[in-house]
From Swiss-Prot:
UniProt keywords, alphabetically: ATP-binding, Cytoplasm, Developmental protein, Differentiation, Helicase, Hydrolase, Meiosis, Nucleotide-binding, Phosphoprotein, Repeat, RNA-mediated gene silencing, Spermatogenesis
Oligomeric form and interacting partners: Found in a mRNP complex, at least composed of TDRD1, TDRD6, TDRD7 and DDX4. Interacts with RANBP9. Interacts with RANBP10. Interacts with PIWIL2 and MAEL. Interacts with BMAL1 and CLOCK. Interacts with Tex19.1 and, probably, Tex19.2. Interacts with RBM46.
Ranges spanned by the short sequence motif Q motif, renumbered to the chain: 261-289
Region listing for Disordered, in residue ranges: 22-228, 681-702
Family: Belongs to the DEAD box helicase family. DDX4/VASA subfamily.
Motif DEAD box per record, residues: 419-422
Protein name per UniProt: ATP-dependent RNA helicase DDX4
Coiled coil: none
Length: 702
């Protein structure tokens, strides 16, 4: 029909919309232009348009693509970048609903032409859902739809109002149709009119897919090994493990139970004792000596202990002992699973690590641990839970999704554990944690036992913890280690921003193949530095929050096995990760807080092993860390560079900057409750007492 009269199409809604004719079963072709051009002859499109179309990614001129929603009855499953849905069933029938439009909001207009106006300002968007503006054709699903006389999605080309509406001001065609979505409604889609936006809903599994959530996650992590040797593979303790006995421990609160010296004193069941022995645990660490009897006594606990000191076992063992003694309620034969224990951690890698520890200690018992986290298929998480769940290990986002979709009940929760609790209660996850304890069915803090563990507990975090803990909770502070582990040799180098890469390569070449973690501040920089090191012939991988879960797990696997001895990471890997034989940590970028510095360098020097941490200090951006760094180095009996001391004494730090830089403080984190009774300070062997620290001010590191 030659050049189409676009004005007539716009201003005369009774004229039927032009719909290009497609050959059946050929929507899966690669480029939009190719598919369209095969039918352009029958559609009276000129040869010149055809040539122009083939030179771009879309149809009808440069910068635009012809899109196709395809068959919305699960006939098309995968989309490509061109806007077509790849066909998974060759038996698609013509009477299925189809909806097509011109993409890139272009219509016949160049999508990049900012001078366009009037009806050509916006056309349709032809990718999935018919999208905004443009020509769309909705074929009814049944004859009754035609008889009802109502159009199901939109009406005029470019009209924001429903087709059944007669109101308008003459230039409604410049807006969008169907409440902001062009064309007509397609199959399995709800269009809600009356507002400027369209509420679109698709019949997808679990309701995960939405406009804002992006593509549906299909990744299912491989199951962990089931053989006993793999389950009980353990971390070898280092030469300094016995030095833990010299660390001071402060327990504050009323009527704290006495510490234990051996696992036998805990009176655990024989199965647990056997699993402890298989895991290679022969001696209690300081946090375990005090935390295990406190949890066994049913008391709420806030425990602060150095990185790599066995905090996970300190809460898992007594919880499992309670479950073995009191019995469990969850069963795979129950329709709704109601876990007795919920453990929450801030990162996927850490919560998976906790799950593996829970599976290890519960081996051969009736207790079943389950782990769920984001980046994996939602249905997979549900399937794991319905098989039986006594201990639920979860990241905050996936946990709230599971609760919101009523896949678990909370009435039986007896134990709530927040690992890396300072991170869980800050502005990052604090609101979600408050939602958790406010969920219907969740027992109040007086009816459950709440345990908080971390290597650092700033004062403001302790105040927030009051919403989670009973007022009679006990506080355990393990020694002077909230600053840094003494088994880590710390080195601070003064390196400018533009000299860091050269210095990093120099250090890594001297290190050789020893396992090294390099921390940077941003996700983009993590990939950039990893690529740069690979170009320098240094095998490197990276991990950060923007990588898919499959890629994150692959990166960790390559790092653990030594395939890539260098791992460039953001703070997603700074907390809790227990990777054997990490000899070096390099802070390419120093973090914004000293607490994060402590967690980062804690990836090495674990369980009595020695390690080395090197940090690049940029005087243009890191001066705020000078004073707390001097304090951390001094407390860990490390050499403090003279230039760093000079910067520290010349830099003003607000009084509220740090709770751990208290003058003369013995403990890096102390109980902030005022006028409490029963505070006592002991060495970890429990033989003698030492004088409690002097009162300190209210400075804060955070």
């Amino acid at each position: 029909m030659g050049d189409e009269d676009w004005e007539a199409e716009i201003l005369k809604p009774h004229v039927s919309s032009y719909v290009p004719v497609f050959e059946k079963d050929k929507y899966s072709s690669g480029a939009n232009g190719d598919t369209f051009n095969r039918t352009s002859a029958s559609s009276d499109i000129g040869e010149s348009s055809k040539k122009e179309n083939t030179s771009t990614t879309g149809g009808f001129g440069r910068g635009k693509g012809f899109g196709n929603r395809g068959f919305l009855n699960n006939k098309f499953e995968e989309g490509d970048s061109s806007g077509f849905w790849k066909e998974s069933n060759n038996d698609c029938e013509d009477n299925q609903t189809r909806s097509r439009g011109f993409s890139k909001r272009g219509g016949c207009q160049d999508g990049n032409d900012s001078e366009a106006s009037g009806p050509f300002r916006r056309g349709g968007r032809g990718s999935f859902r018919g999208c905004r503006g443009g020509f769309g054709l909705g074929r009814p699903n049944s004859e009754s739809d035609q008889d009802q006389g109502t159009q199901r999605g939109g009406g005029l080309f470019g009209s924001r109002k429903p087709a059944a509406s007669d109101s308008g001001n003459g230039d409604t065609y410049q807006s969008r149709s169907g409440s902001g979505r062009g064309g007509y409604k397609g199959l399995n889609e709800e269009v809600v009119t009356g507002s400027g936006k369209n509420s679109w809903k698709s019949e997808t599994e679990g309701g995960e897919s939405s406009d804002s959530q992006g593509p549906k996650v299909t990744y299912i992590p491989p199951p962990p090994p089931e053989d006993e040797d793999s389950i009980f593979a353990h971390y070898q303790t280092g030469i300094n493990f016995d030095k833990y006995d010299t660390i001071l421990v402060e327990v504050s609160g009323h009527d704290a139970p006495p510490a234990i010296l051996t696992f036998e004193e805990a009176n655990l069941c024989q199965t647990l004792n056997n699993n402890i022995a298989k895991a290679g645990y022969t001696k209690l660490t300081p946090v375990q000596k005090y935390s295990i009897p406190i949890v066994l006594a049913g008391r709420d606990l806030m425990a602060c202990a150095q990185t790599g000191s066995g905090k996970t076992a300190a809460f898992l063992l007594p919880i499992l002992a309670h479950m073995m003694r009191d019995g469990i309620t969850a069963s795979r034969f129950k329709e709704l699973q109601e876990p007795e224990c919920i453990i929450v951690a801030p990162t996927r890698e850490l919560i998976n690590q906790i799950y593996l520890e829970a599976r290890k200690f519960s081996f051969g018992t009736c207790v079943r641990a389950v782990v769920i986290y984001g980046g994996t298929q939602f249905g997979h998480s549900v399937r794991q839970i319905v098989q039986g769940c006594n201990i639920l290990c979860a990241t905050p986002g996936r946990l709230m999704d599971i609760i919101g979709k009523e896949k678990i009940g909370l009435k039986q929760v007896k134990y709530l554990v927040l690992d890396e609790a300072d991170r869980m209660l800050d502005m990052g996850f604090g609101p979600e944690m408050k939602k958790l304890i406010s969920c219907p069915g969740m027992p109040s803090k007086e009816q459950r036992q709440t345990l908080l563990f971390s290597a650092t507990f700033p004062e403001e975090i302790q105040r927030l913890a009051g919403d989670f803990l009973k007022s009679s909770y006990l506080f355990v502070a393990v020694g002077q280690v909230g600053g840094a582990c003494r088994d880590v040799q710390q080195t601070i180098l003064q390196v400018g921003q533009y000299s860091k890469r050269e210095k990093l390569v120099e250090i890594l070449r001297n290190i050789g193949d020893e396992r090294t973690m390099v921390f940077v501040e941003t996700k983009k920089k993590a990939d950039f530095i990893a690529t740069f090191l690979c170009q320098e012939k240094i095998s490197t991988t990276s991990i950060h929050g923007d990588r898919e879960q499959r890629e994150r797990e692959q990166a960790l696997g390559d790092f653990r096995c030594g395939k890539c001895p260098v791992l460039v990471a953001t703070s997603v890997a700074a907390r809790g990760l227990d990777i054997e034989n990490v000899q070096h940590v390099i802070n390419f970028d120093l973090p914004s807080t000293i607490d994060e510095y402590v967690h980062r360098i804690g990836r090495t020097g674990r369980c009595g092993n020695t390690g080395r941490a090197i940090s690049f200090f940029d005087t243009d951006s890191d001066n705020h860390l000078a004073q707390p760094l001097v304090k951390v180095l001094s407390d860990a009996q490390q050499d403090v560079p003279a230039w760093l001391e000079e910067i520290a004494f010349s830099t003003y730090v607000p009084p509220s900057f740090s709770s751990s830089t208290r003058g003369g403080a013995v403990f890096a984190s102390v109980d902030t409750r005022k006028n409490y009774q029963g505070k006592h300070t002991l060495n970890t062997a429990g033989i003698s007492s030492s004088q409690a620290p002097n009162p300190v001010d209210d400075e804060s590191w955070d």
